[in-house]
């Protein structure tokens, strides 16, 4: 009762404050727009697009984590196929700005216009999230690393240096987006300002003390976006429920956006759940979070919006191989996403829906190469149970129009006859449609509970099911029980089976319901009198019909498979168990993301994936994927005479109830060639006294001051970013005269970093790294007779960092914080010798962006990379051959580069996914770091001493599926024991597919070697 009273007070106050300036909805809540367009509006209930309410079910993908534009279609088609109305993406400033005078939105995978065009073609809205800061477990949170020196201030504020830095990128990104807004007939419907920037207040938000610096920064971004053509609403995402930032409903402070949202990861955003206790409290599996009161307090006149809700978790360096998918698997999907509906959330974007790969130097130190994120679409682009489980809800929310406008009427166990089960009652105030979200009273409990439910319907108050039996929650599950649900011109009075979707075909409705396998369901169709079973799954028991009070009640138990019931008034009801529902599809025959029922869908049962369908005259063209021979059944208009699957006509038969049946053939099998011959060369000549470091690969490290707020303990400044070298491996050569007994080094490189040291070609030792240590010091004592008392000595430090920290840590330096020589005679208080000078080498060309296609992330400073051994076309004919193909091994502390070429000839008409598998042979040393290169792309960081990732998916486009492939492996042994590594690859899946990956034009993504590289030796 307290909540209802509070809601009324808020409603009255909002009307009083806003009625003069805003339109009113049917219930009195103010209807907002941004003053620039009414194409997008919103109120307490939901977003409206072109005047129609929409349940925004969205998912995130990052185009820069899959740098093959031809595969963006694959990801977006899979998002659309699952029933999502929307997708979201971060754009990455770092990806588009390799240096402070370049903004590139045209080269290779930097041209983002195909994303907008695909959204229009496929029929999905877009939430654009341009940063400039994005977090995203990306190095420096997506900032270009040239920004991290301190020369641009402390960042994320109104400092003019920082402002002038972000403007070129932000203005170009905004200008491109402005052409693809909903106001221009395209599909961008909101634009996020910054990211998880909850800094509006200087202290506790309840005290309302403005942070004028943060406000000025937000206003600069908002002004820039408007000046460069953005007309759609601005959004912002609070990082947690404590920030209370940027809501017009909460305060009239500056910087507020149009619609605010909340990011939430109730099961922790990382597989290491201890990292989330400061935000979430102690981790308790399946513990849901109350959001209703938060939104009612913070943003009552806006839709309850979650710009990021947990779609999975990233895997930290020491996390398990393959991630922690069980933590956010099908039970998490089923329970938590329905729980959000119980909390009146009508706009929700899953982070991530497709994660991708931290290829090159994308990653922040918190994670390794994989960014699979345990997402519904896996890193290798496959789909499985989590994707299908998500589809069960997203198809429902797309079809449940009345769900976009509901009030929370009540909640508790009083709705059920089982105190272990509670329900949340949502009701549409206009249509009186009801949605009862049921779950365990204690969400952490996964017991098998049977119950009946008290519901309010247009036929009165009922207890359902009515014909006996029960509703069941078996495990960590939730069910949404609907009442007075409209499908076409008909009304579902109630259903204890969940609604999957419906279609109006030839002006006749087909309703699709599902239950978990072997569970029962009951539904009542208003005004219907009779029904019959026209198809029943093989092991399903009888389906019962009962006419009561002018309505037809149908009771059933659904074993594995599909049943079909025909009801008078030309109503068809399809009954599915969970396994059949997983493979049930509703491709839209329209580009409208709202999928109006008069433009409708067709319904298809059976395939692994249905990407799309189109109808022309009497031919229904279906595009999709099959991974084995599959029986399919299609519910389509009566005039359909021909069905094609990926352009090939299917032999069909017609069922007695009007569906069409066919069989899709299995795809061809694929056998990958074996790696049989490798070449090898030494990739650390810099350790040798004879090496000449005077070439253009090297830069004097001679800065005696730094703008970085973290000052070094010794000079010169040995921060790699100061000298234009930003990624991974950097090499430092320090010179001194006379003798010394050793050196003390303090190096900072992020979690899991490491370094090794050599004096005059002699190996001194290594710091091997630790998944939780970002900075380490080491004292290396010099062996006798290694130093040259009368000539110059050279210390080489090879240092590997794992990216820049996120948020306020972006400026944390990478490099040597302290370097001190130890005196040779400690008994006579002799003066410590000093380094005379230092030089540094890193990525070939530094910030010059020598390889604009692969980009600034791709390469480190290893000799092999600088001179281009990893690139296609390099001549390795003079190299030594490896004696064994089973293991690439050597002794001694150095870096070796192994190289081979191998052909592929993948047939047309298939989608094929391939992963590399790296390992360490039994009893071989594991104190090494390896990098996998595929046709010039660094697509794997393998660190068996610290990490557990061994499988590295590599997409087509990086791999050449119809030609020669150059594979390279750089192996850095950090002890004299050397290293041994195994390299293999595997097929993840083969599908007969409309995607046809071998037909993608990707040659321009793999530029080859040129002699220009030799100058960086």
From Swiss-Prot:
GO biological process: polysaccharide catabolic process
Glycosylation sites: 23, 100, 158, 211, 411, 417, 456, 628, 681, 737, 770, 777, 785, 828-829
Documented EC number(s): 3.2.1.23
Keyword annotations: Carbohydrate metabolism, Disulfide bond, Glycoprotein, Glycosidase, Hydrolase, Polysaccharide degradation, Secreted, Signal
Disulfide bonds: 271-324
Chemical reaction(s) catalysed: Hydrolysis of terminal non-reducing beta-D-galactose residues in beta-D-galactosides
Signal peptide: 1-20
Compartments in which it is found: Secreted
InterPro entries associated with the record: Betagal_dom2, Betagal_dom2_sf, BetaGal_dom3, BetaGal_dom3_sf, BetaGal_jelly_roll_dom, Galactose-bd-like_sf, Gly_Hdrlase_35_cat, Glycoside_Hdrlase_35
Main location: secreted
Binding site for substrate: 90, 135-137, 195, 265, 373
Annotated Gene Ontology cellular component terms: extracellular region
Keyword Nucleus belongs to the record: no
GO terms assigned for molecular function: beta-galactosidase activity
Main EC class the enzyme belongs to: hydrolase
Superkingdom as given in the UniProt entry: Eukaryota
Family: Belongs to the glycosyl hydrolase 35 family.
Function: Cleaves beta-linked terminal galactosyl residues from gangliosides, glycoproteins, and glycosaminoglycans.
Protein's name in the database: Probable beta-galactosidase B
């Amino acid at each position: 009762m307290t909540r209802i009273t509070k809601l009324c007070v808020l409603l009255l106050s909002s009307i009083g404050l806003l009625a003069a300036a805003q339109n009113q909805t049917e219930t009195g809540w103010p209807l907002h727009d941004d003053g620039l367009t009414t194409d997008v509006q919103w109120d307490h209930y939901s977003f409206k697009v072109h005047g129609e309410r929409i349940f925004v079910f969205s998912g995130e993908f990052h185009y820069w984590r899959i740098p093959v534009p031809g595969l963006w279609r694959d990801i977006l088609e899979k998002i659309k196929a699952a029933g999502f109305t929307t997708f979201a993406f971060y754009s990455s400033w770092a990806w588009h700005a390799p240096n402070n005078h370049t903004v590139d939105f045209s080269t290779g995978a930097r041209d983002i216009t195909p994303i907008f065009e695909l959204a229009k073609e496929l029929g999905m809205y877009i939430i654009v999230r341009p940063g400039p800061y994005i977090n995203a477990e990306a190095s420096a949170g997506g900032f270009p690393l040239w920004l991290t020196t301190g020369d641009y201030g402390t960042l994320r504020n109104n400092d003019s240096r920082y402002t002038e830095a972000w403007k070129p990128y932000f203005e170009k990104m905004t200008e491109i987006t402005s052409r693809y807004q909903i106001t221009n007939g395209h599909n961008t419907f909101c634009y996020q300002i910054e990211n998880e920037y909850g800094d509006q207040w200087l202290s506790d938000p309840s005290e309302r003390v403005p942070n004028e610096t943060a406000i000025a920064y937000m206003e600069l971004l908002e002004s820039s976006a408007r000046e460069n053509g953005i007309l759609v609403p601005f959004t912002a995402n609070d990082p947690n429920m404590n920030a209370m930032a940027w809501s017009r409903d909460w305060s009239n402070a500056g910087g507020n956006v149009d619609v605010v949202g909340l990011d939430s990861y109730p099961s922790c955003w990382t597989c290491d759940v201890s990292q989330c206790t400061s935000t979430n409290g102690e981790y308790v599996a399946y513990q849901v979070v109350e959001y209703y009161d938060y939104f009612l307090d913070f943003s009552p006149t806006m839709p309850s919006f979650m710009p990021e809700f947990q779609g999975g978790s990233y895997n930290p360096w020491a996390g398990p191989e393959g991630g922690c998918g069980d933590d956010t698997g099908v039970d998490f999907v089923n329970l938590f996403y329905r729980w959000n509906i119980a909390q009146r959330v009508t706009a929700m974007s899953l982070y991530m829906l497709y994660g991708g790969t931290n290829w090159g130097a994308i990653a922040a130190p918190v994670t390794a190469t994989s960014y699979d994120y345990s997402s519904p679409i896996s890193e290798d682009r496959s789909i499985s149970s989590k994707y299908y489980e998500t589809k069960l809800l997203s198809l429902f929310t797309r079809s449940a129009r009345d769900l976009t406008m509901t009030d929370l009427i009540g909640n508790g166990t009083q709705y059920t006859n089982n105190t272990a089960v509670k329900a949340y009652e949502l009701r549409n105030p206009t249509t009186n449609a009801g949605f009862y979200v049921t779950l365990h009273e204690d969400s952490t409990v996964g017991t098998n509970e049977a119950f009946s439910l008290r519901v309010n319907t247009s036929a009165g108050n009922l207890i359902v099911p009515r014909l006996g039996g029960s509703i069941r929650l078996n495990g960590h599950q939730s069910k949404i029980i609907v009442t007075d649900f409209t499908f076409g011109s008909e009304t579902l009075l109630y259903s204890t089976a969940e609604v999957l979707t419906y279609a109006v075909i030839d002006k006749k409705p087909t309703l699709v319901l599902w239950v978990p396998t072997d569970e029962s369901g009951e539904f009542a169709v208003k005004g219907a009198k009779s029904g019959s079973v026209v198809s029943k799954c093989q092991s399903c028991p009888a389906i019962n019909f009962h006419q009561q009070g002018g309505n037809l009640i149908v009771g059933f138990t659904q074993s594995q498979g599909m049943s079909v019931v025909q009801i008078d008034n030309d109503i068809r009801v399809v009954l599915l168990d969970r396994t059949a529902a997983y493979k049930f599809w509703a491709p839209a025959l329209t580009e409208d993301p709202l999928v109006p029922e008069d433009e409708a869908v067709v319904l298809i049962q059976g395939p692994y994936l249905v990407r799309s369908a189109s109808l022309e005259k009497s031919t229904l063209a279906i595009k999709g994927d099959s991974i084995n021979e599959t029986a399919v059944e299609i519910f389509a208009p009566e005039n359909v005479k021909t069905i094609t699957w990926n352009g090939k006509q299917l032999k069909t038969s017609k069922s007695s109830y009007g569906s069409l049946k066919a069989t899709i053939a299995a795809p061809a099998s694929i056998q990958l060639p074996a790696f049989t011959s490798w070449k090898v060369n030494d990739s650390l000549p810099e350790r040798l006294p004879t090496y000449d470091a005077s070439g253009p690969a090297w830069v004097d490290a001679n800065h005696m001051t730094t703008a970085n707020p973290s000052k070094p303990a010794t000079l010169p400044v040995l921060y790699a970013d100061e000298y234009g070298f930003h990624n991974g491996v950097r090499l430092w050569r320090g010179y001194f005269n006379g003798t010394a007994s050793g050196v003390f080094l303090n190096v900072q490189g992020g979690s899991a970093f490491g370094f090794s040291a050599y004096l005059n070609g002699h190996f001194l030792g290594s710091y091997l790294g630790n998944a939780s240590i970002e900075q380490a010091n080491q004292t290396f004592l010099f062996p006798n007779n290694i130093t040259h008392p009368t000539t110059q000595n050279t210390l080489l430090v090879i240092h590997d960092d794992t990216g820049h920290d996120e948020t306020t840590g972006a400026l944390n330096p990478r490099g040597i914080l302290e370097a001190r020589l130890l005196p040779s005679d400690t008994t006579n208080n002799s003066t410590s010798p000093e380094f005379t000078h230092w030089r540094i080498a890193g990525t070939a060309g530094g910030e010059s962006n020598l390889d604009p296609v692969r980009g600034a992330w791709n390469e480190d400073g290893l000799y092999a990379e600088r001179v281009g051994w990893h690139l296609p076309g390099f001549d390795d004919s003079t190299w030594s051959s490896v004696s064994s193909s089973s293991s690439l091994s050597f002794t001694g502390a150095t870096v070796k580069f192994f190289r081979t070429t191998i052909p592929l000839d993948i047939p047309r008409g298939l989608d094929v996914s391939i992963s590399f598998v790296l390992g360490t042979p039994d009893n071989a040393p594991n104190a090494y770091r390896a990098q996998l290169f595929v046709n010039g792309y660094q697509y794997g960081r393998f660190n068996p001493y610290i990490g557990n990732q061994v499988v590295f998916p590599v997409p087509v486009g990086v791999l050449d599926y119809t030609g020669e492939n150059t594979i390279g492996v750089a192996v850095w042994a950090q002890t004299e024991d050397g290293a041994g590594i195994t390299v293999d690859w595997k097929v993840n899946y083969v599908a007969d597919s409309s995607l046809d990956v071998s037909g993608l034009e990707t040659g321009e993504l793999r530029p080859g070697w040129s002699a220009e590289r030799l100058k960086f030796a």
